[in-house]
Amino acid sequence: MTDVTIPTERGPMPAHLATPAGPGPWPGVVVIHDALGMSRDIRAQADWLAGEGFLAVAPDLFHGSRRSTCLFSLFRGWVPRGDLDAARNWLADRRDCTGRIGVIGFCMGGGFALAVASDHDFAAASVNYGGLTKEVERALPRACPIVGSFGTKDRWPGVREVPDRLEPILTAANIDHDIERYPNVGHGFMNDHDPGDLSIVDRTIAKVVAARYDEPATRDARARIAAFFRRHLGDAPPASDGPGAAT
């Protein structure tokens, strides 16, 4: 694992790169953080994907701006499409990448993953408790294959209904998908944040939306995501020795 910098139209974008052990090339995955930004948790998400045989990069989408400024822009419909395209292209241009790239996102990042599932050259998308805007919904008939994971106890506004909106559209468009609703888990169940990463406001919001890490649901969701990515990104046998150091 190592820190890298990806050139974008907004300037250099810091990112965490996790490389599988053993010889490449490997399929790639762009890992999109939640509203907390870059953290130990999102690095760990990239690392487990590398352990499954995927070259994973987690870009800092808040680069060059305050987190509060980016979150304010989010409520006005901000989607960092240029940064995500830059991360995808950066992976695709590497000699240790096969050129088949997926995208995965959590919470805010799950909504971004849905947004770039259509018309952005990703081969598969993993959407984890992400929101769905009307604009993104209209583009879904052109989406890549989607694997989605949601909690039935999620209290984030609108998210619990996303699976019921996704499935009919993807089915009608004949797009391969795997949408799972996990019983008795809430928002953010795959994100195991350090307490020090959470402000008082973050902790309050987490309580309101029933956000809590759930190990059994996470284990099952990760297995489904890895299998779905292997099917659509190409061969990526699990790396028995875990992620290795990137160069």
Task: List the model feature ranges, each with a label.
Residues 3-96, 193-212:
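Serine-hydrolase catalytic machinery in alpha/beta-hydrolase-like enzymes
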Residues 155-163:
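Conserved alpha/beta-hydrolase "acid-adjacent" motif
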Residues 176-247:
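C-terminal catalytic histidine-bearing segment of alpha/beta-hydrolase fold enzymes
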Residues 57-59, 127, 148:
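Hydrophobic residues in well-ordered beta-strands that form the structural core
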Residues 86-143:
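Primarily recognizes the serine-hydrolase "nucleophile elbow" in alpha/beta-hydrolase
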Residues 148-150, 182:
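Short beta-strand/loop motif that positions the catalytic acidic residue
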Residues 61-65, 131, 185:
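Short beta-to-alpha linker loops that shape the active-site pocket of alpha/beta-hydrolase fold enzymes
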Residues 141-146, 174-176:
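Short, proline-enriched alpha-helix->beta-strand connector loops that line the catalytic pocket
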